[in-house]
Amino acid sequence: LYSQLAALARRYGAKRLVLFGSRARGDNRYNSDIDLAVYGMPEGSRSNFWMDCEDLPTLLKFDIVHITDGMNPAFLANIEKDGVTLYAAKD
């Protein structure tokens, strides 16, 4: 599943895709959602990315956050602290 998410991030032009929350920390329950932080994805691609994520073969829900300037620094620090990078574009 994570490799499919990375492929979607690449397809839709994200600079970085990070898994965060309980699944990244390893304290998730079987039905915990999948928290994703998306960096640098063009605005016009975001809804298609979300729809394609929802079409992946899982019953789990996705909570997708597109990282933008001006977001809460504490929230961003938590993502960086616990996050697992699933995709990073090569510059």
Give the role of each language-model region.
Residues 1-16, 24-30, 39-91:
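Catalytic core of pol beta-like nucleotidyltransferases
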